[in-house]
From Swiss-Prot:
Family: Belongs to the mab-21 family.
Residues annotated as binding Mg(2+): E73, E75
Source organism of the structure: Homo sapiens (Human)
Pfam families given in the database record: Mab-21, Mab-21_C
Disease: Cerebellar, ocular, craniofacial, and genital syndrome: An autosomal recessive syndrome characterized by moderate to severe developmental delay, intellectual disability, cerebellar hypoplasia with ataxia, variable microcephaly, ophthalmological anomalies, facial dysmorphism, absent or underdeveloped nipples, underdeveloped labioscrotal folds and scrotal agenesis.
This protein's UniProt keywords: ATP-binding, Developmental protein, Disease variant, GTP-binding, Intellectual disability, Magnesium, Metal-binding, Nucleotide-binding, Nucleotidyltransferase, Nucleus, Transferase
Protein name, entry field: Putative nucleotidyltransferase MAB21L1
Enzyme class: transferase
UniProt record, GO biological process: anatomical structure morphogenesis; camera-type eye development; cell population proliferation; eye development; positive regulation of cell population proliferation
InterPro entries, A to Z: Mab-21-like_nuc_Trfase, Mab-21_HhH/H2TH-like, MAB21L/cGLR
């Protein structure tokens, strides 16, 4: 048994050193190319409207606010200033979303974003995004990369298509530090020793982002309060949780397997599903020794089996916001197909680790 485990770990490490590192290098090259174009567009936006200041800065070889959705799809979060005069309200009525409400009606004129405040005192995510979309469309026509970049049509999101190969979504957002959403108040679970109190304090201090983007849990609902709502995002908190042991290596292998074998019709699976399942696996295996290099095969196998279970149940709860289903709106046939494909993949890896050379 131990020999079989060791063999699997050996082949997973080989896979990581060859396939995953090649994927990372290719994505890093793409990011540099894409960020040159996005920075140029945002510089042009800032000239037209100084309230939208580019926050796309490179630090330690990574860009703050940039998320890799897939090797050809990215999201850049554009942090806005001055959320000050608004209260953050998440009463759970909009899963995965919250609203920003004027703390005092008399402060309306003090807000940097006064024309985007609704009659009822909410800062409208939709109105800000609409204004930003107009500015980006103008900037695309003026910027020095105008021959290789165009706006993606038929969406209220701000999306750029670059060199007909890559899609980048630029999302206006507020960074919320030092507060924690009520809808995530159950976290961490009291009976689970992971993460330790110090890491919990770090994660909560890191806070979360409020994004101006279409909220999939509200698809089909048209009430104005809902279209004015902001989407909660915990990217930095999640990254912090997945430090240490073989967690990041495990996630990297899962992302590479997804890119190569689970990019399926209906797009049932993305990298965020993988990231979410790694967090759940950390809860199931709370000891640091469970994430030793020698356990890499066990952890990967556990996550793939959990993924199959989620696909068969057609439900994948968000790690911090369990009322939010990450499979919402995905076609059932696509989820079933993904379950079958994941099962084939898991069986292949477990019964014949050497097959990773071809996967």
């Amino acid at each position: 048994m131990i020999a079989a485990q060791a063999k699997l770990v050996y082949h997973l490490n080989k896979y990581y050193n060859e396939k995953c590192q090649a994927r990372k290098a290719a994505i890093a090259k793409t990011i540099r190319e894409v960020c040159k174009v996005v920075s140029d567009v945002l510089k042009e936006v800032e000239v037209q409207e100084p309230r939208f200041i580019s926050s796309l800065n490179e630090m330690d070889n990574r860009y703050e606010g940039l998320e890799v959705i897939s090797p050809t799809e990215f999201e850049v979060v554009l942090y806005l200033n001055q959320m000050g005069v608004f209260n953050f309200v998440d009463d759970g009525s909009l899963p995965g979303c919250a609203v920003l409400k004027l703390s005092d009606g008399r402060k309306r004129s003090m807000s940097l974003w006064v024309e985007f405040i609704t009659a009822s005192g909410y800062l409208s995510a939709r109105k800000i995004r609409s204004r930003f979309q107009t500015l980006v469309a103008q900037a695309v026509d003026k910027c020095s990369y105008r021959d290789v970049v165009k706006m993606v049509a038929d969406t209220s999101e701000v999306k750029l298509r670059i060199r007909d190969r890559y899609v980048v979504q630029i999302t206006p957002a507020f960074k919320c530090t030092g507060i924690w959403p009520r809808s995530a108040a159950h976290w961490p679970l009291p009976h689970i020793p992971w993460p330790g109190p110090n890491r919990v304090a770090e994660v909560k201090a890191e806070g979360f982002n409020l994004l101006s983007k279409e909220c999939h849990s509200l698809a089909g609902k048209q009430s104005s309060a809902e279209s004015d709502a902001w989407v909660l995002q915990f990217a930095e908190a999640e990254n912090r949780l997945q430090m240490g042991g073989c967690r990041k290596k495990c996630l990297s292998i899962l992302k590479t397997l997804r890119d190569r074998h689970l990019e399926l019709p209906g797009q049932p699976l993305n990298n965020y599903h993988m990231k979410t399942l790694v967090s759940y696996e950390c809860e199931k295996h709370p000891r640091e020794s469970d994430w030793d290099e020698s356990c890499l095969g066990d952890r990967l196998n556990g996550i793939l089996l959990q993924l199959i279970s989620c696909l068969q149940c057609r439900r994948c709860p968000h790690y911090f916001l369990p009322n939010l289903d990450l499979f919402q709106g995905k076609p059932h046939s696509a989820l079933e197909n993904a379950a079958k494909q994941t099962w084939r993949l898991a069986r292949e890896i477990l019964t014949n680790p050497k097959s990773l050379e071809k996967l």
